[in-house]
Amino acid sequence: RDLEALTEIAHKDFREAYRIFTDKNFATVIAEADPKQKALYAGLSKQPVTWQNLEEFLVATKQKAAVSISLKTTETEFYNVKETIQESFEIQRSGWGHLRLDIESKGGFLEPERKVVTDEEFIGSCLKLNYVIHADQLKSGNQIGEIIVRSPYQELRYQVTASKSPQIRIDIRREEK
């Protein structure tokens, strides 16, 4: 019952649940829990205790599901790039609880607006992540880069193709006689 109460509090106010989780008296509350839960708490309550520790505790004790993320689209293309462009893509979350995303890019021409995103930055279940395509960093031909979005449980990749040249389409059709 005590874990259920902590979960209810966390669902309404994660900050308050974190305060309870890190309070030295919580160890006496969890003393009645099964040995696995006590061992889990012992490991996750060691300093420094982060919000992620509370999230992992609730997930591991099956009090809640891990927050999951998805991308609305996974790739985009830009051709005839002559100057720096700012663009964005959408990250969607499902579930409740603490979420920290680490953002990195591969490809010298791509620069995400932020390196870290937290659940507080989502509007409802959506977040628009801005990024910049630096035209001066593009070489000849198509350049392919990625923006990598990592949570403790997932890694998603958003692929960006960019070129200074116009898009070339080759249309191969068989003529019927």
Regions found by a protein language model. Give the residues of each.
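Extracytoplasmic/secretory-pathway proteins
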Residues: 2-23, 28
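Beta-sheet-dominated interaction scaffolds and their linkers
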Residues: 23-94, 136-138, 169-177
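Eukaryotic, compositionally biased intrinsically disordered regions
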Residues: 27, 100-104, 148, 152
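Surface-exposed binding patches on compact interaction domains or structured appendages
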Residues: 65-68, 72, 92-130
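Intrinsic-disorder/low-complexity, polar/charged segments enriched in Ser/Thr/Lys/Arg/Asp/Glu/Gln
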Residues: 84-88, 126-128, 155-157
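Short beta-strand edge segments in extracellular beta-sheet folds
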Residues: 159-169
